Structure formats: structure tokens, C-alpha cells
From Swiss-Prot:
The lineage of its organism: Eukaryota, Viridiplantae, Streptophyta, Embryophyta, Tracheophyta. The keyword Transmembrane applies. The chain crosses the membrane at residues 69-93, 134-155, 178-200, 255-275, 291-312, 447-471. HAMAP family: PSII_PsbC_CP43 (MF_01496). It holds the Pfam family PSII. This is Photosystem II CP43 reaction center protein.
Length: 473
């Protein structure tokens, strides 16, 4: 191997077993990275890096299309989606495609169309990825300067950031358009047990929208995860889309200020670390959203939330025992608290028993039975509808608890089914992904800062204290 200008630059690269394995411009000698370091070989080859990213997008979209069609092929209309291990169809159903009152699936054709569109798109992206990886120009700076870049060119980097923000903003507006003009979205709070409806009365008040960001993340507050009506969700997307588009235009038109130039490390690996940090935050927020929120993730499709299944059990047995003659207003439980009903710390009437800890649950099947001071005893005695009983009995036996081998539900529940809730899968997977992306952020941020500071080896081994100590032998 030729001696390179500085071996220190390549301290982190292992020697190849087969030194003859060469890809022009992508081998260890010219890039300092071996084949297994993947896209690190392409740091300075913008054309090839474009190919890698387009091909990666193709793989993602291919998975979406193939998995979509797989779920359509296995879908059984007689069973709820959450009993079939589906994670993609619930998202399409939430957008109002193919479903009617109560979340009943009326037509699976829109789901089929979605899968086919994603497959076709993935073929286009796959072709583009292969073209740019193998045939296209290695670098874009000469032939297509608009698409070329140098990592340390701060102005170009913020322009690229701006373009990304505009695309994200347009994505947020797509949901707004779907909800307002193209058939509406599924609203679990629609009267009578949920339905697809157009959103007409958007919440655009900044006090309401940004109030969510200022709420405590704990208990009944629940930060943005506590959002429980579609007007606020769609209105929030109007705000988010506008902020992203305006921020994108701002970043395209301006150069970074001096404080920003000083504060950030301006290198490819630094941008990777910033992106990983952002994705990590997204993952953790998505985890909490899918676990606790039954408006953006309707229980008709994703199954009940944990608190919802617990409250449903208390409600189901209250209904049963009330029919058998129990006085649910005054019956005492084994601890001396109310067996069926008790008071919360703030005085509302809530369900008694172990489910007391979930007293701030809000769910469409339960809210009609609340009055100004919590659960209304007279409504519980006279106004319970059959659909509320059916839904709570169903949710009681489908708690989002379960293990990887699909032994799901409450361990002591004799009526539970062999089932793992999509909420469990989606929340767990996004927590794990969020965690690993955070570790990736720390790793790449540390390397980027070290490179910027001019040392990549870590501590200088010449000054190791152990070198000055008496040998053990």
C-alpha cells in the first residue's frame, strides 16, 4: 500500500485482507475507508452518495409497498385490524380510506392501490439509485453545480436544509388537504362510535396550538401527546407546514449568522449526527404518541391503549354487577375504597380498584357517561348504550400487553386471545429505534467534534501514565 499523505487520517480503518479488491474512487486507498464502512467511502463523491441515498429510498418504499400488499392479502374483514397484527392498514384507515362508521372496513381496494403505487415508485427510485451508483457522474459539482456541494460550505448546507424543510412542510399540508377537501379523515370521536368526516372548523389559535408545547409531560397534562380532537391535529399541521415552508425559504435566502457558524461543526459527519439526534427525538415522541393517544391512533384500528383496556375492564364489571343488583355507587372494595366508583385527588368520580391510576383516560365510549364532576351516577344507571358495553368488553380482552412470541393480553384474563397489539409493536420499535439513533448521534457527534478539533485518535498514547510506571513483572 502506498504511504498516504498522513496515516493518522486513517487510524480508524482496518487493513483489508484482500488488497486487490478495488472499486475506482471507492477503495480503501483513495478514501481511507474499507468496503464495509459503506457510505463513508462516498463522503467526497456527491454523485455516488446521491445514488446510495436514492437506492436507500427505493428500499424503504419497496418495503412499504410489499408489506402493504402482504397485509391486504392476509386481511380478514370479520376481525378487527388490531387482532391481525397489521401496522400499515391502520394508518391508511386512519386517513379515512376504505372505512365507514365504527371503523368498519367497507373496501380494501384503496389499500391495494396504495401498495401498488409504492411498488411502482420503488422501481423508479431503485433504477435511479443504480444509475447514480454505477453510471452517473462521480461528483455533481462540475456538471450540475446546483446539486453539487462541499460539506464545509455553510451557505450551501443551509440552502439544502431549507429545501428539506419546504418538502416537509408540503408533506404536512398533504394531510391538511386530505382532511379538508379529499374525503376527510377517520374521527374516533364522531357521535355513535366513530366515522370518516371532513374537518371544517380548524383550530388555528396559536394559544391553543402552542399551548400543547407548554403543557407538562406528566399525568393528565401529557404535553402534545394529550391532543384529543382532530381540529387541533389538523390545525397543528397547518401551523407546522407553514413554519417549515417559511423556515425553508428563510434558510435558502440567508447565510448562517456568526454565532451559528461558531456554534456548529460544519462537516458531513456532524450533519449526520444532527440528523440522528432529530430522528431520535421523533422516535421517542412517536413511541409516546402511539402508546397513549387514541385520537391520532384510533383504538378501532390499533386496539385500545393500556389505560383504555384497564378502564374498559372496570366498566364491563360495573355493568355486569349493576345488572345483578349491586349498588355501584356505594359498594365498598377490599381496601375500604369504593369497589366500582371512588373520587380522584381533585374530587371527580372515577372508576375504583386498580384502574384508579388511569383515571385521566379519555375515550369515545366513556365520555358520554361523564358529567361536570366526573362519572355521572345517574347516567351509569340509566344511559349506558349497548355499543358502549360491546366496545368495552372487546377492549378489556385486547390490552396492549404481550411478548415477542405472541402470548398477549392480561396474564390473568381468561377471555384474552393469543394476540399482541400493534400499539405494543409500534411503541416498542420506535422506542428502541429512538434509543439506537441517540447512541448513533453520540458516536458521530463525538467523532465529528474530534475531527474538528484536530485529533481523531482520542488521547495521545505518548502521555499515557502507564508508560511511566514500573512493569508488573
Amino acid at each position: 500500500m502506498k504511504i498516504l499523505y498522513s496515516l493518522r487520517r486513517f487510524y480508524h480503518v482496518e487493513t483489508l485482507f484482500n488488497g486487490t479488491f478495488v472499486l475506482a474512487g471507492r477503495d480503501q486507498e483513495t478514501t481511507g475507508f474499507a468496503w464495509w464502512a459503506g457510505n463513508a467511502r462516498l463522503i467526497n463523491l456527491s454523485g455516488k452518495l446521491l445514488g446510495a441515498h436514492v437506492a436507500h429510498a427505493g428500499l424503504i418504499v419497496f418495503w412499504a409497498g410489499a408489506m402493504n400488499l402482504f397485509e391486504v392479502a392476509h386481511f380478514v374483514p370479520e376481525k378487527p385490524m388490531y387482532e391481525q397484527g397489521l401496522i400499515l392498514l391502520p394508518h391508511l384507515a386512519t386517513l379515512g380510506w376504505g372505512v365507514g362508521p365504527g371503523g368498519e372496513v367497507l373496501d380494501t381496494f384503496p389499500y391495494f392501490v396504495s401498495g401498488v403505487l409504492h411498488l411502482i415508485s420503488s422501481a423508479v427510485l431503485g433504477f435511479g439509485g443504480i444509475y447514480h451508483a454505477l453510471l452517473g457522474p462521480e461528483t455533481l459539482e462540475e456538471s450540475f453545480p446546483f446539486f453539487g456541494y462541499v460539506w464545509k460550505d455553510r451557505n450551501k448546507m443551509t440552502t439544502i436544509l431549507g429545501i428539506h424543510l419546504i418538502l416537509l412542510g408540503l408533506g404536512a399540508f398533504l394531510l391538511v388537504l386530505k382532511a379538508l377537501y379529499f374525503g376527510g379523515v377517520y374521527d374516533t370521536w364522531a357521535p355513535g362510535g366513530g366515522d370518516v368526516r371532513k374537518i371544517t372548523n380548524l383550530t388555528l389559535s396559536p394559544g391553543v396550538i402552542f399551548g400543547y408545547l407548554l403543557k407538562s409531560p406528566f399525568g393528565g397534562e401529557g404535553w402534545i401527546v394529550s391532543v384529543d380532537d382532530l381540529e387541533d391535529i389538523i390545525g397543528g399541521h397547518v401551523w407546522l407546514g407553514s413554519i417549515c415552508v417559511l423556515g425553508g425559504i428563510w434558510h435558502i435566502l440567508t447565510k448562517p449568522f456568526a454565532w451559528a457558524r461558531r456554534a456548529f461543526v460544519w462537516s458531513g459527519e456532524a450533519y449526520l449526527s444532527y440528523s440522528l439526534a432529530a430522528l431520535s427525538v421523533f422516535g421517542f415522541i412517536a413511541c409516546c404518541f402511539v402508546w397513549f393517544n387514541n385520537t391520532a391512533y384510533p383504538s378501532e384500528f390499533y386496539g385500545p391503549t393500556g389505560p383504555e383496556a384497564s378502564q374498559a375492564q372496570a366498566f364491563t364489571f360495573l355493568v355486569r354487577d349493576q345488572r345483578l343488583g349491586a349498588n355501584v355507587g356505594s359498594a365498598q372494595g377490599p381496601t375500604g375504597l369504593g369497589k366500582y366508583l371512588m373520587r380522584s385527588p381533585t374530587g371527580e368520580v372515577i372508576f375504583g380498584g386498580e384502574t384508579m391510576r388511569f383515571w385521566d383516560l379519555r375515550a369515545p365510549w366513556l365520555e358520554p357517561l361523564r358529567g361536570p364532576n366526573g362519572l355521572d351516577l345517574s347516567r351509569l344507571k340509566k344511559d349506558i348504550q349497548p355499543w358502549q358495553e360491546r366496545r368495552s368488553a372487546e377492549y378489556m380482552t385486547h390490552a396492549p400487553l404481550g411478548s415477542l412470541n405472541s402470548v398477549g393480553g392480561v396474564a390473568t384474563e381468561i377471555n384474552a386471545v393469543n394476540y399482541v397489539s400493534p400499539r405494543s409493536w409500534l411503541a416498542t420499535s420506535h422506542f428502541v429505534l429512538g434509543f439506537f439513533f441517540f447512541v448513533g448521534h453520540l458516536w458521530h457527534a463525538g467523532r465529528a467534534r474530534a475531527a474538528a478539533a484536530g485529533f481523531e485518535k482520542g488521547i495521545d498514547r505518548d502521555l499515557e501514565p502507564v508508560l511511566y510506571m514500573t512493569p508488573l513483572n
